[in-house]
Amino acid sequence: MGSSCSRSHSLSEAETTKNAKSADIDRRILQETKAEQHIHKLLLLGAGESGKSTIFKQIKLLFQTGFDEAELRSYTSVIHANVYQTIKILYEGAKELSQVESDSSKYVISPDNQEIGEKLSDIDGRLDYPLLNKELVLDVKRLWQDPAIQETYLRGSILQLPDCAQYFMENLDRLAEAGYVPTKEDVLYARVRTNGVVQIQFSPVGENKRGGEVYRLYDVGGQRNERRKWIHLFEGVNAVIFCAAISEYDQMLFEDETKNRMMETKELFDWVLKQRCFEKTSFILFLNKFDIFEKKIQKVPLSVCEWFKDYQPIAPGKQEVEHAYEFVKKKFEELYFQSSKPDRVDRVFKIYRTTALDQKLVKKTFKLIDESMRRSREGT
């Protein structure tokens, strides 16, 4: 009898403990669900090389704790790889241009520098490439300063030359210093393709503000082979931030050198706009890389892009830059309304001029986005 009571008491205690654990789990799930309801999901989309990942890194720097020393150091090999990649593209580009251009002589590299070019190109093709040192930097500098390479650099838009090329070439000595730790600016310029999905949680008004809106930003690879990973992220999105590199109207895709990058961006934006799951989703368009655009538009006519063939320039200088920008902006606005069904045109749609490397501008832009989305939720 006593034994039976003892067993019954033990079972009762076990059941109580089990119920308490279950209630604790339920309570935590409820808390997490409530917390999730206050997190606004942002999806960062765009074609490859649009500057999405630079925007993502800026958010980490601006609204989180930034990069610690270990994270900064992890970019050393990436940055050195960018240098090798740049010099190889220029070297191979010069060789090709010297064969096909009518004024081919200006692309002929001196014999001594050809030897250096072969050596550095071989390094870029290796998985175990050495980190930059003083000796290698002297070689890179010597080849970079060759007149043929400088002429080739001016043709960078046809060579898949990364935007970071000039920045890293101007900082070679620092990059090769013993104990080199990349700066925040180095990290922003560093080019590494996004594979898979990365996310970050932040508040544009500061993590400590009471009642501040919290956002979760997702960045996914922009190259064609990465886009199949986008679909599973589409549900429950509060806003799509679409990055369009407006400076790339004369460039071809990295993965398909027969396809103009701006035409690819147009088609991709059109496709995203038509997705059923975005019927009520806000759209934010970043017309990015304006810093490169304002320099290029003075030299390369906007009409080289099929989409912009009806563009009529007005005058050289700043006035022309603004005129060209407004033309591109209008094209995207027209595309938005053409691609949106009548019942979707009242969803929030904002366009921002951006330069992903400009920290102040990115900060200001995200504060404006935060304000716009808050007003939309409040119906004001």
Swiss-Prot record:
Q: Where is the composition biased (Basic and acidic residues)?
A: 10-25
Leader sequence residues:
none
Which cofactors is this protein said to need?
Answer: Mg(2+)
The ranges of region (G1 motif) come to 41-54
Region Disordered: which residues? 1-25
> For the G-alpha domain, which residue ranges apply?
38-380
Phenotype of the disrupted gene, per the record: Dwarf plants and small seeds. Short internodes, leaves and panicles.
Name the organs or tissues of expression.
Highly expressed in young internodes. Expressed in the base of the stamen, pistil, lemma, and palea before flowering and in the pericarp of the ovary after fertilization.
GO MF annotations, alphabetized: G protein-coupled receptor binding; G-protein beta/gamma-subunit complex binding; GTP binding; GTPase activity; metal ion binding
Q: Where in the cell is the protein located?
A: Cell membrane
The source's superkingdom equals Eukaryota
Provide the transmembrane region boundaries.
none
Pfam families, sorted: G-alpha
Q: Which UniProt keywords apply?
A: Cell membrane, GTP-binding, Hydrolase, Lipoprotein, Magnesium, Membrane, Metal-binding, Myristate, Nucleotide-binding, Palmitate, Plant defense, Transducer
Enumerate the Gene3D superfamilies for this protein: GI Alpha 1, domain 2-like, P-loop containing nucleotide triphosphate hydrolases
Q: Where is this region: G4 motif?
A: 284-291
Q: Where is this region: G2 motif?
A: 186-194
- Any one GO BP annotation for this protein: adenylate cyclase-modulating G protein-coupled receptor signaling pathway
Q: Where is the lipid attached (N-myristoyl glycine)?
A: 2
Q: How does it assemble?
A: G proteins are composed of 3 units; alpha, beta and gamma. The alpha chain contains the guanine nucleotide binding site. Interacts with COLD1. Interacts with TUD1.
- Family per similarity comment: Belongs to the G-alpha family.
What exactly does this protein do?
Answer: Guanine nucleotide-binding proteins (G proteins) are involved as modulators or transducers in various transmembrane signaling systems. May function in a signal transduction pathway required for normal growth and development of internodes, leaves, panicles and seeds. Involved in gibberellin signal transduction. Involved in R gene-mediated disease resistance. Functions upstream of the small GTPase RAC1 in the early steps of signaling. Involved in brassinosteroid (BR) response. May not be a signaling molecule in BRI1-mediated perception or transduction.
Q: What is known of its domains?
A: The helical domain (69-189) is required for self-activation.
Q: Which protein, by its recorded name, is this?
A: Guanine nucleotide-binding protein alpha-1 subunit
Source organism of this protein record: Oryza sativa subsp. japonica
